[in-house]
Curated annotation (Swiss-Prot):
Cellular localisation: Virion; Host cytoplasm
UniProt family annotation: Belongs to the myoviridae tail sheath protein family.
Record's subunit section: Homomultimer.
Record keywords, A-Z: Host cytoplasm, Late protein, Viral contractile tail ejection system, Viral genome ejection through host cell envelope, Viral penetration into host cytoplasm, Viral tail protein, Viral tail sheath protein, Virion, Virus entry into host cell
Top-level taxon in the UniProt lineage: Viruses
Summary of the function given for this chain in its UniProt record: Polymerizes as an extended helical structure around the baseplate-tail tube complex. During ejection, the sheath shifts to a contracted form, thereby making the inner tail tube protrude through the host cell envelope.
Record's protein name: Tail sheath protein
């Protein structure tokens, strides 16, 4: 084709920084049971997108954990929620039934290549269009389920809340916590108490279900840089076990649990979660919001740069990427989500052979916002103000 043209041509040159949008974080994902749930609304082993949690309860039945968990979430907030319903276990005794239920929750890959149970959460985004970021299995998170949940959380870059399954004492809880080393998990003990409208009595209410809803609420109203701790919980009337807590006294039950990496429950101006720590074996991710900040920053930066993949590697492209990331960091800093962050291009990491192979390395660092876990007020008694008192009297 000839290059000759008698007239005007316009060539678009699409250069410059791109706007970077923060990934959505207030999306709950949970696995539940409900043998009497509406099978069309909640099919077995299929991720279901719920945009109105309170309305979905009408189709959740009364058996199993689904309806109670949905209500616990609805009491806190109105998050987008992905629900996975699995079949209840069968057997001659409760132990056998629970074992089968645990297997159903953990899931596998069936003969048709479809994921089931928790593993189906990995396909939730392709089915529902949203990626669950806040995960749990309220009321059924045995140690085996918690281990499986940790793996799913790592793959989705999500955060999971688990109970100290079967633990009755603080020493048992501390020992149970040693089963986990993942930064993506938080252990919570004990449970709440709440009114059960099915039995018309006060019953144990899964703390993990309320953690899912409250986490979403905090994300929506304050941000992912705020931990779960010290925020009022709705819809509960008590705590299922005695936990000694005092705002000023050290060495309390709550302190022992928090020090061991367990979040507990307290009553002070209502009921609250008390604790910031994850199960991480790396001190860099000691706090819940440190993990979530790492996840959000990583996903935000990666998802925002699909446009750059397969474009010619030029100085302009590199500058656009670096400038765009730094602009986003300034926004996050201004809004209080991070302390600060910087992105840069390293010549040492990007030599001729690297660029020739179609590879590009962009570096950045960031500082998450620490939670104020221990406030010390240093009080002193002095007589120096008495001189001012005498002076003020004589001046009148």
């Amino acid at each position: 084709m000839s290059d000759y043209h008698h007239g005007v041509q316009v060539l678009e040159i699409n250069e410059g920084t791109r706007v970077i949008s923060t990934v959505s974080t207030a999306i709950v994902g949970m696995v539940c049971t409900a043998s009497d749930a509406d099978a069309e609304t909640f099919p077995l082993n299929k991720p279901v997108l719920i945009t109105n949690v309170q309305s979905a309860i009408s189709k959740a039945g009364k058996k199993g954990t689904l309806a109670a968990s949905l209500q616990a979430i609805a009491d806190q907030s109105k998050p987008v929620t992905v629900v996975m319903r699995v079949e209840d276990g069968t057997g001659d005794d409760e132990e056998t039934k629970l074992a089968q239920t645990v297997s159903n929750i953990i899931g596998t890959t069936d003969e048709n290549g479809q994921y089931t149970g928790l593993k189906a959460m990995l396909a939730a985004e392709s089915v529902t269009g949203v990626k669950p970021r806040i995960l749990g299995v309220p009321g059924l998170d045995t140690k085996e389920v918690a281990v499986a949940l940790a793996s799913v959380c790592q793959k989705l870059r999500a955060f999971g809340y688990i109970s100290a399954w079967g633990c009755k004492t603080i020493s048992e809880v501390k020992a149970y916590r040693q089963n986990f080393s993942q930064r993506e998990l938080m252990v919570i003990w004990p449970d709440f108490l709440a009114w059960d409208t099915v039995t018309s009595t006060t019953a144990t209410a899964y703390a993990t279900a309320r953690a899912l809803g409250l986490r979403a609420k905090i994300d929506q109203e304050q941000g992912w840089h705020k931990t779960l701790s010290n925020v009022g919980v709705n819809g509960v009337t008590g705590i299922s076990a005695s936990v000694f807590w005092d705002l000023q006294e050290s060495g309390t039950d709550a302190d022992l649990l928090n020090e061991s990496g367990v979040t507990t429950l307290i009553r002070r101006d209502g009921f609250r979660f008390w604790g910031n720590r994850t199960c991480s074996d790396d001190p860099l991710f000691l706090f819940e919001n440190y993990t979530r900040t790492a996840q959000v920053v990583a996903d935000t930066m990666a998802e925002a740069h699909m446009w750059a993949v397969d474009k010619p590697i030029t100085a302009t492209l590199i500058r656009d990427i670096v400038d765009g990331i730094n602009a986003k960091f300034r926004e996050l800093k201004t809004n209080g989500y991070i302390v600060d962050a910087t992105c840069w291009f390293s010549e040492e990491s990007n030599d001729a052979e690297t660029l020739k192979a179609g590879k590009l390395y962009i570096d950045y660092d960031y500082t998450p916002v620490p939670p104020l876990e221990n406030l010390t007020l240093r009080q002193r008694i002095t007589d120096k103000y008495l001189a001012n008192l005498v002076t003020s009297v004589n001046s009148n």
